[in-house]
């Protein structure tokens, strides 16, 4: 028993390190995606194609999650995880050999497909190996390591560009990519059989069994996604209005990422204490972010970045932990896939709406108030319903 606990803990940290090194590759490559496409003489549609890759990745999350739920195979789940990380580890460094903007855009899209393939199964495994010491804490530590890689990757690429150029910058990302593959295979070797899969004798098809609480959670989170402004839109607004320079916007984003990393473990700890009630902080923070962005003096923009960073952290930690809390283990792959698709779709729709309304601050604020208010009310209902269901089981 003691050996199993140690092995599970080792696998947990291995998966965290896998995300760290894989994010060095992904974020390192993404940090210069627009500049690299421009360097290859790409038209404005070039960067937009990368956005299509993000959407395709969300669709693949659902497909991978559905297949993992139907077949209930530990090997299949691990296969999706290993294949997904391998795709990222290869596709981004291959950019070093591209001379066509279209091929470069395709490689960026392929990377997003890799994330879509691995994400639901990875979250299932992280949830399982975190249960002994707390889902919130587990996903919080995982997000902290993930963000550490997201910080180091762009830094390595930036330094490489100064001294050696694009090709060397991309080739250097082969190193963390190779390390991520070795680590994820090591994790599989140590923990090849998932108890959440092996205990299921006959898999259920379809969405039956996800439960009313899960769909209420999806509705609340989708409303949040509609009202949560993407950083790209925010930075466009700040630039077009002359509020901040490019350098200052980049610095504000760095603050957001730093906050994301710093609050990951504390937020996870709070989640383990009060469960779904911690989700209630998100809609007010999302609305506060919009208010500061639109109406506050430029000196307070860093405070907006803090709000944005906390919400992003919650999306990558406690929102993932919430699914593991409210969905039975055998249904988690499908739940993660369905949630990822719907959340990503509504966030994209919200982005288009904000882009359309951006010329009128009052309209932007009205949309933000409406969506975040709905989200808050649904999260309150969700929290109450979860507590009632939990008390009935005692």
Predicted regions and their residues:
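Juxtamembrane intracellular "pre-TM" segments in multi-pass secondary transporters
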Residues: 1-9, 191-220
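Helix-loop boundary and gating motifs at the non-cytosolic
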Residues: 3-58, 214-242, 248-252
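Loop-to-transmembrane helix entry/capping segments in MFS-fold secondary transporters
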Residues: 44-45, 132-142, 246-247, 329-339
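Helix-to-loop junctions at the C-terminal end of transmembrane segments
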Residues: 60-75, 161, 263-275, 358
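Structural signature of the two symmetry-related core transmembrane helices
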Residues: 78-93, 174, 277-292
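Intracellular juxtamembrane helix-capping segments at the cytosolic ends
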Residues: 117-130, 314-327
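C-terminal transmembrane helical hairpin of 12-TM major facilitator-type secondary transporters
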Residues: 275-319
């Amino acid at each position: 028993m003691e050996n199993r606990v140690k092995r599970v803990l080792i696998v947990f940290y291995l998966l965290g390190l896998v995300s760290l090194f894989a994010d060095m590759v992904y974020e390192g490559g993404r940090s210069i995606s627009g500049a690299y496409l421009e360097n290859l003489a790409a038209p404005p549609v070039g960067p937009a194609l990368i956005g299509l890759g993000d959407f395709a990745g969300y669709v693949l999350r659902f497909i991978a999650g559905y297949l993992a739920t139907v077949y209930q195979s530990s090997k299949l789940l691990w296969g999706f995880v290993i294949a997904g990380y391998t795709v990222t580890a290869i596709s981004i460094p291959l950019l070093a050999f591209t001379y066509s903007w279209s091929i470069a855009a395709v490689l960026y899209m392929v990377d997003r497909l890799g994330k879509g393939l691995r994400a639901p199964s990875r979250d299932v495994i992280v949830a399982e190996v975190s249960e002994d010491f707390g889902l919130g804490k587990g996903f919080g530590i995982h997000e902290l390591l993930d963000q550490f890689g997201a910080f180091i990757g762009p830094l390595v690429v930036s330094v490489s560009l100064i001294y050696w150029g694009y090709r060397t910058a991309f080739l250097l990302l082969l190193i963390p990519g190779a390390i991520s593959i070795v680590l994820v295979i090591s994790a599989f070797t140590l923990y090849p059989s998932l108890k959440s899969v092996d205990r299921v004798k006959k898999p259920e098809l379809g969405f039956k069994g996800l439960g009313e609480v899960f769909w209420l959670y999806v509705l609340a989170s989708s409303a949040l996604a509609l009202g949560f402004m993407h950083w790209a839109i925010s930075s466009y607004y700040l630039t077009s209005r002359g509020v901040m320079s490019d350098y200052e916007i980049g610095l504000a984003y760095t603050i957001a990422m730093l906050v994301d990393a710093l609050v990951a473990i504390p937020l996870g700890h709070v989640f383990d204490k009060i469960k779904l009630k911690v989700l209630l902080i998100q809609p007010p923070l999302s609305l506060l972010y919009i208010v500061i962005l639109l109406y506050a003096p430029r000196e307070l923009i860093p405070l907006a970045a803090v709000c944005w960073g906390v919400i992003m952290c919650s999306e990558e930690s406690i929102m993932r932990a919430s699914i593991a809390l409210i969905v039975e283990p055998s249904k988690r792959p499908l739940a993660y896939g369905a949630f990822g698709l719907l959340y990503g779709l509504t966030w994209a729709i919200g982005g288009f709406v904000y882009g359309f309304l951006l010329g009128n601050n009052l309209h932007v604020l009205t949309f933000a108030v409406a969506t975040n208010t709905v989200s808050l009310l649904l999260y309150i209902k969700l929290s109450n319903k979860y507590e009632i269901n939990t008390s009935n089981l005692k």
